[in-house]
């Protein structure tokens, strides 16, 4: 994630972030504790499409939630212990990732990474449950994958992120 900070004289500080998936978010932190969060159009980073304002307490609570400190569902704890080392992960295929335009079979996810592709949510939100080995992965597809941590991390690093290219 790219992060750029700048001072806003008389107002506070501005933080701009561009995520791995090329989403742009700006946060303005006012001297009085208010925070304004802006989300920009994915095709035009100058066009704000949504915004929200938080007071200081709301911003701190949101930070704890995003950081995973505020809430962990009890059911999730039970599932984690029942499944032991099995992890289910949602991962978006980044622009420039080696997996783009490859089939699941081409990637050899089962043999090479010991991972199963449970589903794919296409960029247009079309859902493919239990996709076949002939299913092609496109930029922006979200893969729901399961396996053990090492194989999952390796697959994500080597095939689903632009760094793997």
Swiss-Prot record:
GO MF entry, a single one: monoatomic cation transmembrane transporter activity
Gene3D superfamilies in UniProt: Regulator of K+ conductance, C-terminal domain
Entry-linked Pfam families: TrkA_C
Record-level GO BP terms: potassium ion transport
Domain (RCK C-terminal) ranges: 76-161
GO annotation, cellular component aspect: plasma membrane
PANTHER family: K(+)_H(+) ANTIPORTER SUBUNIT KHTT (PTHR30445:SF8)
Name of this chain's protein: Uncharacterized protein YrvC
SUPFAM superfamilies tied to this protein: TrkA C-terminal domain-like
Species this protein is from: Bacillus subtilis (strain 168)
